[in-house]
Curated annotation (Swiss-Prot):
It holds the Pfam family Herpes_UL3. Keywords: Host nucleus, Phosphoprotein. InterPro entries: Herpes_UL3 (IPR005035). Belongs to the alphaherpesvirinae HHV-1 UL3 family. The keyword Phosphoprotein applies. Coiled coil: none annotated. It is found in: Host nucleus. One of its GO terms (cellular component) is host cell nucleus. It comes from Varicella-zoster virus (strain Dumas). Phosphorylated. This is Nuclear phosphoprotein UL3 homolog.
Length: 221
């Protein structure tokens, strides 16, 4: 057992040097909670020369030229809790990026799914005595990387994909027992002080996605 809870993904990214930006909420009239972290607005020029070669591994390994790598400095995290569509939303976002942003280079991770009750054993016993047994939470997360100059385009495509979701039936949330018409989707935007270099094979432009099958679009990370 851990003495302390592990940090959240946004907290870990902030500790690694990614500055957090807040955007509009995916649900109209939904109250947003201010982040406890300040946004890093001061950026420094990258000290890496674009014409230099980027070594791979330790000394003595084969060096690849800059043409094999793509620099990224902006990261979007798409996260939802209790999304009924499972991976349908994240697969839709991938297809939207491939079809509508084919002229820019974007990298996208696979969908990460998590589940858990989110309550301590003692609290769970108390809730059981009150005849309220919360079901487990299901969380989906996906990360999209792009360059700062392309961030507005990627941001708009993300919001368009989220807002274009079909209305779903009312259901009982596991947290408070109240009915809500739609599951909120959160988009976090981070900006790095230094560029992150990824091999071009890991970008969406090199990853074919089957647009006819709405549930099985995947990319490599």
């Amino acid at each position: 057992m851990f003495s302390e809870l592990p940090p959240s993904v946004p907290t870990a990214l902030l500790q690694w040097g990614w500055g957090l930006h807040r955007g509009p909420c995916s649900i109209p009239n939904f109250k947003q909670v201010a982040s406890q972290h300040s946004v890093q607005n001061d950026f420094t020029e990258n000290s890496v020369d674009a014409n230099e070669k980027f070594p791979i591994g330790h000394a003595g390994c084969i060096e690849k030229t800059k043409d094999d790598y793509v620099p990224f400095d902006t990261l979007f995290m798409v996260s939802s809790i209790d999304e009924l569509g499972r991976r349908q939303l994240t697969d839709t976002i991938r297809r939207s990026l491939v079809m509508n942003a084919c002229e820019i280079t974007v990298a996208c991770t696979k969908t990460a799914a998590f589940s858990g009750r989110g309550v301590s054993r003692q609290k769970h016993v108390t809730l059981s005595k009150n005849k309220f047994n919360p079901s487990s939470h299901k969380s989906l997360q996906m990360f999209v990387l792009c360059q700062k100059t392309h961030a507005p385009r990627v941001r708009n495509l993300l919001y368009e994909s989220i807002r274009a979701r079909r209305p779903r039936r009312y259901y009982t949330r596991s947290t408070d027992g109240k009915s809500r018409p739609l599951v909120p989707v959160f988009v976090y935007e981070f900006t790095a002080l230094d560029r992150v270099l990824l091999h071009k094979e890991n970008t969406l432009t090199d990853q074919p996605i089957n647009t006819e099958n709405s549930g099985h679009g995947r990319t490599r990370t």
